[in-house]
Amino acid sequence: MWVNPEEVLLANALWITERANPYFILQRRKGHAGDGGGGGGLAGLLVGTLDVVLDSSARVAPYRILYQTPDSLVYWTIACGGSRKEITEHWEWLEQNLLQTLSIFENENDITTFVRGKIQGIIAEYNKINDVKEDDDTEKFKEAIVKFHRLFGMPEEEKLVNYYSCSYWKGKVPRQGWMYLSINHLCFYSFLMGREAKLVIRWVDITQLEKNATLLLPDVIKVSTRSSEHFFSVFLNINETFKLMEQLANIAMRQLLDNEGFEQDRSLPKLKRKSPKKVSALKRDLDARAKSERYRALFRLPKDEKLDGHTDCTLWTPFNKMHILGQMFVSTNYICFTSKEENLCSLIIPLREVTIVEKADSSSVLPSPLSISTRNRMTFLFANLKDRDFLVQRISDFLQQTTSKIYSDKEFAGSYNSSDDEVYSRPSSLVSSSPQRSTSSDADGERQFNLNGNSVPTATQTLMTMYRRRSPEEFNPKLAKEFLKEQAWKIHFAEYGQGICMYRTEKTRELVLKGIPESMRGELWLLLSGAINEKATHPGYYEDLVEKSMGKYNLATEEIERDLHRSLPEHPAFQNEMGIAALRRVLTAYAFRNPNIGYCQAMNIVTSVLLLYAKEEEAFWLLVALCERMLPDYYNTRVVGALVDQGVFEELARDYVPQLYDCMQDLGVISTISLSWFLTLFLSVMPFESAVVVVDCFFYEGIKVIFQLALAVLDANVDKLLNCKDDGEAMTVLGRYLDSVTNKDSTLPPIPHLHSLLSDDVEPYPEVDIFRLIRTSYEKFGTIRADLIEQMRFKQRLKVIQTLEDTTKRNVVRTIVTETSFTIDELEELYALFKAEHLTSCYWGGSSNALDRHDPSLPYLEQYRIDFEQFKGMFALLFPWACGTHSDVLASRLFQLLDENGDSLINFREFVSGLSAACHGDLTEKLKLLYKMHVLPEPSSDQDEPDSAFEATQYFFEDITPECTHVVGLDSRSKQGADDGFVTVSLKPDKGKRANSQENRNYLRLWTPENKSKSKNAKDLPKLNQGQFIELCKTMYNMFSEDPNEQELYHATAAVTSLLLEIGEVGKLFVAQPAKEGGSGGSGPSCHQGIPGVLFPKKGPGQPYVVESVEPLPASLAPDSEEHSLGGQMEDIKLEDSSPRDNGACSSMLISDDDTKDDSSMSSYSVLSAGSHEEDKLHCEDIGEDTVLVRSGQGTAALPRSTSLDRDWAITFEQFLASLLTEPALVKYFDKPVCMMARITSAKNIRMMGKPLTSASDYEISAMSG
């Protein structure tokens, strides 16, 4: 290809000149062995090794053309090529178009300018013609992409993210090479002294990813799969490489978890011209995602918020009159600040609250200041901004985008997390400054609605205010303490600001740890969790969602109804319909908002507590924050997030409570207790008034509080737990301890806890103060950091998801092993292949939506499903009958048979049932499967199925199916037509796909699970008609085409075919013939007599068989009211018959025009003439009204040939089986055992160029070689 001219100083270093003229030189890289160039011996090996180690572009383009003027020492690269043919074309173009022109110039500088301009013009023209879009990738990276695709056979859909120089340890020997990291694969390539090594691992197969340090190797990345371990070292920047590997592995785990694929973000701003382009656009995208994810987690922002940039600055804090050093973060809808010193100060300013952004006057004390004012009259002063003008411009742009919008149905259907809405209104509460939607009928700014006529709406007040009960004897002291807490918070708001824009400091955390006052709890939960932002930007969303979900029922709503009365049953708010109805609405609305989660046990307990302290809509948004941001993946069908944190807790217990860890592991207690603790935030194991204090801390600090508290509980019971003899005793110890945790500041009457109600201990457990327990957890385990938890979560996520996948595989195998003849090992390998094919189609594209093919809520056997395109590839690799061009047709028939529910997808059970019958079934089972595949109706003509008939007639015969009529009589009009050289063709319009699919369902109903016992009886199988029989014969013929005993099998099949044809003809005698109009005039030959010769032509040595069949006609040739018009349309179709003109004859096959022109082709067919044997003549029907006569262009020399199939001809499965048993060769073929593991191994190791038919195996696509 042509390249932008670049200077080259040493033209002959490592290059061999092959052609030269005064201005241009064509060179080949030393050591390149392609195109007969020779390997170059030792020097070639050294150069090849050097190219790999130094990542030279010569590995991709070993040929190049240089430009040089006679008097200059500087060369210019103007073209490069991967083959001699490609570079020669460029060379010839230069000689023909430029060489003569250059001799005209006198000045060498003019020549150089002309050549460079010409080459750049060619490149620009090529890009314009081929619509090549400019991207941010460097030329070097584009070369790496070409290498990656070529070296590993990856399709264009596989995107390379980055590549790094490193060493791979194969045994005890390091191999220096390059690691290529793509979206779905980790690849390594090395070429040293002629020895090549390749490694390809899918991210979804990685079970462990670690960065280790040893004495010999200070920096090693260890990659583990189920079957092997791989070590990489000698990285230039191991931290950057490992972070990217973690990110790509996380994307793969997300794909396994919920089928969430990767889509590149095209909205990233382009790099400035002055910026050095060092990374690919995809790498920039992933880096931006990682930064945005950390940004959202740090400030509790909505899931779709993208970080635009950050800069160092100082913030003036009025509460202590100081300038605090920190970082400002700017995104589409927020300006945030956090101090360099942890927990000193943080700030969140939504742009919807901003009124003024202005540059203040600079001074030596306050350089480059920026003032931001909000609607609640707070002003924030930032200073020491490096690029203040640019920052102000970006904020101004985002402010313009933040326009006022009212929530619409379109947003409801499309995006649930729109974050650029703004509604201006007054704050309606002490704490929250978020806007509320106001209506003329409600002065409080809340929208009242009654969606359930039987329940009182709770949208305007919390359940706690309606069901608040105080104990008179404890009223005064506890209420006084509660009042003091409220006053402390009000003082805090006055000093640090209130609402979303408040300064968050260490003082804020101290107040939270002392307990939030009950009257402020709901609003502070909204504020601290960030749920206030989603509520403010989605006014009316919850009401609309409830209205749309009311009255709809699914599995989630059934589970919700079942658990409603189990939600805090001890609290009076949930002992009547009002509280139950509110809980129902919130849970149902969320199930419809997020169908991937729907409803999970423990959500009802958490939501009921949220409803006690927050209004109904607020409780909904708190639940959204909890499920989607603060506890990710906790509440899905497999509680993956809770299992991940359970593993993290085990690691933390090992580090912080080592003396207890081994004992607890032996008892298995940690995994048992932690799941309920984490899923319900201790609400199900602690007294209610104590557990809500834990929830207070959780909304402020996040999951680290739960880990700290769990470790504190274990630490407080070390001695007792060490003395426990079994898990039951340990559980009792912990249960009693948690039951004794009390909140002495609570103004609520004591609510009996479930555990304490069931306890029969005589000796009460000493009381434990919840505030003291929380303080202890901070003192002993407060060093646990959020980023450390995220690192541990990643490690555990790999382990948990792969363990779940292995469990799923074992369950599937255990369920299906008794239904098939496969071994457990074979089934496990087949399942791995089946799932791999599904996953490959997810990221490389498929003919159906990946989300439709994977539903984790279904039983294990039905979770993964494949469509026909995927099945076709697996059929070709695994099924013993797949052979030749007919393989796709046979795959289509089997897929149609296995797809019992008609959804165009098959699950693993269906797939294995067909494969088991074909590979390990007995003779009768195999033949029954083959018979069933052909007794189904033909697929609709609009399906993209490979044709099984004459290609020459496909153009004419597409939508109208020739219907075989048994000709028993000809009237005078018909005889005249025959004498004139016309051929009778009865045409019946195709009824279309709908009728065909209905017919398919009728056939498939015979083999539904309910009728399996019936289908086992061969007598209940439908009969095979003549057209289906022809297709069955063709299938058998193609099955044997690559068999060593091909000739013997062919003759045996021909004998069976002849026998079955005779059986079918005899069977017709027992079928009552309808009354015919007219006499039994002229007669013709038996319809079947032409079939054997057409299906099984005589074949000479080395000649291929030619098998033809009937093709349907196009809709444009459908019968018209005037017969002669259709005849005119088909005038050019030449049909030939084997019978004499003077006999109305019926034949079974149609021969294309191309074949009739080839004498040798015609002579190879064994065609029986029916006119010479009077005893073989049959009576013919009268020609019907829909009969069309077509003139033959061959005149009297051409023999008319009928395309009709006999509708009365049919055979049964018993006849087919009995006939085949007469041929030992066929019996031996179908009884032959199939080595399944060999086929599976072949399928695992195969690598397809381009879009794969089946992906590579369970684990490595290609093994290390060399």
Swiss-Prot record:
Residues 415-456, 1075-1095, 1132-1164 are annotated as: Disordered. It comes from the Eukaryota. The record marks 601 as: Glutamine finger. Residues 425-441 have a biased composition (Low complexity). Keywords: GTPase activation, Repeat. Residues 886-921 form the EF-hand domain. Residues 515-702 form the Rab-GAP TBC domain. GO terms for molecular function: calcium ion binding; GTPase activator activity. Gene3D superfamilies: EF-hand (1.10.238.10), Pleckstrin-homology domain (PH domain)/Phosphotyrosine-binding domain (PTB) (2.30.29.30), putative rabgap domain of human tbc1 domain family member 14 like domains (1.10.8.270), Ypt/Rab-GAP domain of gyp1p, domain 1 (1.10.10.750), Ypt/Rab-GAP domain of gyp1p, domain 3 (1.10.472.80). Residues 146-213, 293-361 form the GRAM domain. InterPro entries: EF-hand-dom_pair (IPR011992), EF_hand_dom (IPR002048), GRAM (IPR004182), PH-like_dom_sf (IPR011993), Rab-GAP-TBC_dom (IPR000195), Rab-GAP_TBC_sf (IPR035969), TCB1D9/TCB1D9B_PH-GRAM1 (IPR036014), TCB1D9/TCB1D9B_PH-GRAM2 (IPR036017). Pfam families: GRAM (PF02893), RabGAP-TBC (PF00566). The keyword Repeat applies. The record marks 562 as: Arginine finger. The arginine and glutamine fingers are critical for the GTPase-activating mechanism, they pull out Rab's 'switch 2' glutamine and insert in Rab's active site. May act as a GTPase-activating protein for Rab family protein(s). This is TBC1 domain family member 9. It comes from Homo sapiens.
